Amino acid sequence: MSVLPPNRSQTGWPRGVNQFGNKYLQQTKPLTLERTINLYPLTNYTFGTKEPLYEKDSSVAARFQRMREEFDKIGMRRTVEGVLIVHEHRLPHVLLLQLGTTFFKLPGGELNPGEDEVEGLKRLMTEILGRQDGVQQDWVIDDCIGNWWRPNFEPPQYPYIPAHITKPKEHKKLFLVQLQEKALFAVPKNYKLVAAPLFELYDNAPGYGPIISSLPQLLSRFNFIYN
């Protein structure tokens, strides 16, 4: 319960003035933070193919069994994924890997024990989309835009650590990758690289899963420059 002070006019309380003037307190404008990201047309990029790149696990059950075995040895799995954005007609599109007709994923994967997140993502991006002619792709990892946790050896993941979970089984970090103005990507033959517009991803967990469908919200804080 708050108590109001006595009548200020009778007790010497300053009335609507700063008793220190501007000598010690400076009036500052609100701080505005704006991140600018350059986007280039999809037609600026060339897409080739290379040998198939297969998953480590043959089934979902095998994936969780391996995760369980590795958790006992090295602890929580660390995963990183890259968000690559282009534009078509000034509409942002996210590059996704498509396997089959209904499965979509961001490029990335598991980090090795003790591996740096940024360097690990660069390694994984090169393995998945890197050129075959020996020219090194310069991946510019710009910003971490999301964190997701898997509390158990099961499919559900959350953008927070659920209550009473002290040992998550996997931590996934999403990084925005700033693409160069032009580039060549080599896509494994068993995948298709598709450009999905943000309006298609938005609120579309049934089609793309909870993580990819959350990208429009995660990316809304950026100011896109359409080159």
Curated annotation (Swiss-Prot):
UniProt-annotated location(s): Nucleus; Cytoplasm
GO process annotations (BP): cell differentiation; co-transcriptional mRNA 3'-end processing, cleavage and polyadenylation pathway; mRNA 3'-end processing; mRNA alternative polyadenylation; mRNA processing; positive regulation of pro-B cell differentiation; positive regulation of stem cell differentiation; post-transcriptional regulation of gene expression
Presence of keyword Cytoplasm: yes
Keyword Oxidoreductase listed: no
Listed GO CC annotations: cytoplasm; mRNA cleavage factor complex; nucleus; paraspeckles
Pfam families: NUDIX_2
Region (Interaction with RNA), start-end ranges: 102-104
InterPro entries xrefs: Cleav_polyA_spec_factor_su5, NUDIX_hydrolase-like_dom_sf, NUDIX_hydrolase_dom
Site feature: Interaction with RNA: E55, R63
Positions of the Nudix hydrolase domain: 76-201
Motif (Nudix box): 109-130
PROSITE patterns reported for this sequence: NUDIX
Coiled-coil segments: none
Superkingdom of source: Eukaryota
Gene Ontology molecular functions: identical protein binding; mRNA 3'-UTR AU-rich region binding; mRNA binding
Protein keywords: Cytoplasm, Differentiation, mRNA processing, Nucleus, RNA-binding
Gene3D superfamilies, sorted: Nucleoside Triphosphate Pyrophosphohydrolase
Summary of subunit composition and partner proteins: Homodimer (via N- and C-terminus); binds RNA as homodimer. Component of the cleavage factor Im (CFIm) complex.
Chain's role: Component of the cleavage factor Im (CFIm) complex that functions as an activator of the pre-mRNA 3'-end cleavage and polyadenylation processing required for the maturation of pre-mRNA into functional mRNAs. CFIm contributes to the recruitment of multiprotein complexes on specific sequences on the pre-mRNA 3'-end, so called cleavage and polyadenylation signals (pA signals). Most pre-mRNAs contain multiple pA signals, resulting in alternative cleavage and polyadenylation (APA) producing mRNAs with variable 3'-end formation.
UniProt record similarity statement: Belongs to the Nudix hydrolase family. CPSF5 subfamily.
Protein name: Cleavage and polyadenylation specificity factor subunit 5
Record organism: Xenopus laevis (African clawed frog)
Name of the coding gene: nudt21
